[in-house]
Structure formats: C-alpha cells, structure tokens
C-alpha cells in the first residue's frame, strides 16, 4: 500500500498572509480601544469608528485567516457564507422587530 500525497483540498495561507492579517487585526483593535480610553472624539464618532473597524476586521479575518475569495473552485464556501449572513440578518432584524413591537404594544396600555 502506498500513501497518496495528493492534496486536492483548499490551499493553506502563507506566513505572509497570516502576518498581514495579524498586524491588521491588531491595528483595527487598537484604534477603537485608544479612542474609547482617551475620549478622543464624541461618543457618536467613537461608535461609528468602532462599527466601521469591526466590519473591516471581519473582512480581514475572512480573507486572511479563512481564505474566503471569489475563485470558482471555492464557490461553495462563498455560497455557504452568503447563506449564513442572510440567515443571521433575518434572525437579528426579526428579533429587533419583534422586541420593538412588543415594547410599543406593552406601553400603549
């Protein structure tokens, strides 16, 4: 019996990709942390910065660590990711809608 060395699965990232992702993640974490700790801006600006940095950090993690891209051979990964985002969005928006309606209806009486 011989052992096959053929790896037909998805390729792993390089050290450069992992280090780039790690450094970007640190930067995207330190900036909002610094803004909150020093009070560098108004609360609305800080909240906007935190949300923007969080979205960018999610994208960095998806690309650098989870190797999500639009290549055709990884189409199923992207399809599964889009489906997951859709389901989470439905759950979050639906939950907020239900809580808002409950609050509105309970306060009427």
Swiss-Prot record:
Gene ablation phenotype (knockout): Increased reduction of the ubiquinone pool (in aerobically grown minimal medium with glucose).
- Give a yes or no for keyword Cell membrane in this entry: yes
Q: Using the UniProt record, give the first listed, main subcellular location.
A: membrane
Residue stretches spanning the membrane: 18-36, 46-64, 81-99
- Describe its assembly: Heterooctamer of two A chains, two B chains, two C chains and two D chains.
**Biological function:** Cytochrome bo(3) ubiquinol terminal oxidase is the component of the aerobic respiratory chain of E.coli that predominates when cells are grown at high aeration. Has proton pump activity across the membrane in addition to electron transfer, pumping 2 protons/electron.
- Tell me the protein's name: Cytochrome bo(3) ubiquinol oxidase subunit 4
**What is the gene called?**
cyoD
């Amino acid at each position: 019996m011989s052992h096959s060395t053929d790896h037909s699965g998805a390729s792993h990232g390089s050290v450069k990709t992992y280090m780039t992702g790690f450094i970007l993640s640190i930067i995207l974490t330190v900036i909002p942390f610094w803004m909150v700790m020093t009070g560098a801006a108004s609360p609305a600006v800080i909240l906007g910065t935190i949300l923007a940095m969080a979205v960018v950090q999610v994208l960095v993690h998806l690309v650098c660590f989870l190797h999500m891209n639009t290549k055709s051979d990884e189409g199923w990964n992207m399809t599964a990711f889009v489906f997951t985002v859709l389901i989470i969005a439905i759950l979050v928006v639906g939950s907020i809608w239900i809580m808002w309606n409950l609050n509105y209806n309970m306060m009427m009486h």
